Amino acid sequence: MKKYNAILIGNGTMGKRHRARFESCGVEFVAIYDSKECTVKSPLESLDADFVVIASPASTHYNYVKDFLNRGIPVFVEKPLATTAAEAQELVDLALSKEVPLFVAQSECFNPIFLNFRKQMVAELKMAKRDADGKINLKLEFRREHGYSERCRDVNVALDLMVHDLSMFLTMFKYENVQLENFVNSGDDESWAFLRVVSGEYAGVEACIKVNRNSNKDVRMISASFDDAEYIVSLAKYRGDGEVEHVSDSLDNEHRFFLRLLYGACKDWGRRAAQNAANAVKIAAG
């Protein structure tokens, strides 16, 4: 595979993680821009590379992504894609019109634990009982909680955390078949959303998504309840002391997938993934 050169914008927690994984795949970062560290003095707009990694604060994503797409440079950007529904869709449309790869790092969609869960759910849904109206009685609950952190305080918890769960939900059910029934923000740190699949093959499915980034718990889980069965899966691994262990495969998988996009593979899948990320923002942004 070709050796790629890249630019990194934002060398914080996620920037460092993305950089390390791309470097392990042979990528060389020719420039790093961060509020605390810059490896080059040249203006950002004068630099060229095979792609850019954007891991700066969420409120800056839209402007950075738009600039690089307009320059024809492929973009790998941390979630959320943007902070408004209109901006998120604009970026997806721009990438499509420019024929430039756009990838949003929503790593839970690449979490092998979730991928196994989704495979099981698809099989169960195919065999699920239906009521007199042909609807499926399946209730999903997504929970994502962790303690307070100074990271990602420029956006509310829905754009910070809920986009993960929304993107997973939207890989199972088509956005155009889904209706947002209720959305509640309890300050900047706690939100929940109630969604219903109102049309299509899986009409009747309901989902409640709860997120909290100022909790005394550390939870990343999905539960699924049918008429006669229940499944619960944790998306995180826990050490013996109860602390969460990061599932490294999630990040590794998404980086490998992005490099395949650069190589020209999986184009249709890549476009659907970018649209999925925009659709998650549309729901999370309210």
What are these regions (language model features)?
Residues 1-38, 259:
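N-terminal Rossmann-like dinucleotide-binding module
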Residues 1-3, 8-9, 38-41, 51-56, ...:
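C-terminal helix-rich "cap/oligomerization" subdomain common to oxidoreductases
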Residues 18, 37-94:
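Beta-loop-alpha module in the N-terminal Rossmann-like domain of NAD(P)-dependent dehydrogenases
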Residues 71-73, 98-101, 202:
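A short helix->loop->beta-strand "cap" motif at the edges of active sites that frequently abuts
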Residues 82-152:
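A contiguous active-site-proximal alpha/beta segment in oxidoreductase catalytic domains
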Residues 148-217, 275-278, 282:
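Rossmann-like dinucleotide-binding domain that binds NAD(P)(H)
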Residues 185-188, 202-260, 266-270:
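NAD(P)-dinucleotide binding in Rossmann-like oxidoreductases
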